Amino acid sequence: MGVPLPIRMTVLRLDDGDLLLHSPIRHDDRLRRALERLGRIRHLVAPNSAHWMFLPDWQQHCPDALTWAAPGLRERRPVKKASLRVDHDLGAAPPAAGTEEIEQAIVPGGFGFAEVAFFHRASRTLVLTDLVLNLEPAKLPPLARPLARLTGTTAPDGRAPVYLRWVIGRKREQASRAAARLVAWNPERVIFAHGRWFERDAAGALRRSLAWLLPG
């Protein structure tokens, strides 16, 4: 959108006690130590082509963590230039391979875009990245508020920004099937990278946010 946005990292604690960091934010020693008190940081996830830039620092401080990246991310020129190590490409199998605690779906788009969505079964939490923006105007720069409202990305009825809807529309049929799967999971909460997450009536809010993409 061309303006600074509030950003969120989501942390999942897996059945074995290890932590999965989804879309890691800027590394901070205090934050890392707080997380390490909760469990071993084992998985670092870059869920789409826009959410990877802080990963090199996390890799440096968590050398034993595995890095998982959205399909095609490792081939992008900025990623290669940054020397980001990608251990695994996200595909049909989730990072917690061999377990049934996480399901995932790939929402594809044109120009090499793909966003990988995660559903944590135990907490019934759907973790997205940019597929929904639900920005709170009070937390945006004053000049950015009209633009956010114009693009339909403000709370409580946020959705994907216009440019991303256009990109995803390039593979609408496949993306529509993936969106239907997200809704079918019937999540109790939906967390995403930007804005107020869906804490109540999450399934209904998700359906409204994805109405532009859902079949029919």
Feature-to-residue mapping (PLM):
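Residue-level detector of flexible, active-site-proximal loop/helix-junction positions
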Residues: 74, 111, 197
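Active-site HxH/HxHxD metal-binding segment of metal-dependent hydrolases
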Residues: 33-98
